Amino acid sequence: AKVKNARSKDLADIFNNTASSKMSLDDILEFSYEIAIGNEKISLEEFNKLVEGSNGLIKYKNKYVLIDKEESKKIFEQIAKANFKSLSRMELIHASMSGQLDQYDFDYDAAFAKIIQDFTKPVDVNPPETLKGELRPYQMTGLKWLWTNVSKGFGACMADDMGLGKTIQVISLILKMKEEGLLTKPVLVICPTTLMGNWMKELQMFAPSVDAVIYHGTERKLDVKHDVILTTYAIMRIDVEELKKQTWGMIIVDEAQNIKNPDTAQTLAIKMLKSDIKIAMTGTPVENRLTELWSIFDFINQGYLGSLREFQKSYAIPIERFKENSRAAKLKMSISPFVLRRLKTDKHVISDLPEKMVLNEYCYLSKSQAVLYEKTLNEMMDKISGFTGINRRGNIFKLITALKQICNHPYQFLKS
């Protein structure tokens, strides 16, 4: 069966400029199925009659054609069920990148071809003039990768190894978009509380021209008249009703493994926020299950990997349960344009990084701690020796906890 594109709506200007590409990712592309034997197109009815009246060998216009009857029935049922189909541009790109279209003789028209061609074409960009610092070559590559995705209306997952400078690459993107006049609304950065100070420090160091504020604390008040607003996951979850009223110029989620569970209140809240551009930063896009990857993609490029149920059926179950390498390869291929993962141990990425130095620093117990530690250990070991089974295991765990508390501070164990 030959699948030919019949028509597409208003595709001539796809990706011609940043604004139109951002607004067009969910536009609908339309196509229809057609059947051909050789180069001769035939109707559905004629095809069905030929298949029904054959035992695998059919005669068509003085030619004999060998055909798989069962496969032909499947083709007929598929076409009869949905002779006219539609895809969003996001779905078309996923189908193309994952190889789903390879099973068909898919006849693209010029507009369809342009979508795929422009999508795979990198966009060059110069470093921002207002950046106070110099990007390493691999960081410049990261900026170009971010710029390519953002300029075509896609989100991205920056998954570089810790220490390669994910933050400065994303800050460079903010500066470049600001210089190009593409940021007319504030950028919202959501990160763990422990990283908020580091974000502010790096913004002040590398991007002093950016007006950044912290939205945190009991006296917080949302003021969107700033370039960048920094907040935490906890505050975002508490104030989601306020934050979702805004349409943000860009939303950046640092330590994105915090949204790996698709059903948690935190993840659901963050996906309520509105922005055309969403960036996830994480050194561990997948920690335990593939659905964690789906959850991050549902944030950066909603719909690209289908619904959660579709993803589980197409990828998670075949890969995790049945170890299907072909599915894993398809998934890797389909997500590769949107995930940048580089390791600092890779000399092709960075060759002048010194070897990791491990320095052991020992913290010694005070005299009172040492006495209490030994006394507690001896007393509880004598007690444990008289126990068996679950009682013994429970008391061993209790001893470990007690010794940890003493090492931290005797007060934590003594409670006085």
Q: For each predicted feature, which ranges?
A:
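Accessory nucleic-acid engagement/destabilization modules that flank
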Residues: 1-114
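Long, charge-dense, solvent-exposed interaction surfaces that engage phosphate-rich ligands
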Residues: 328
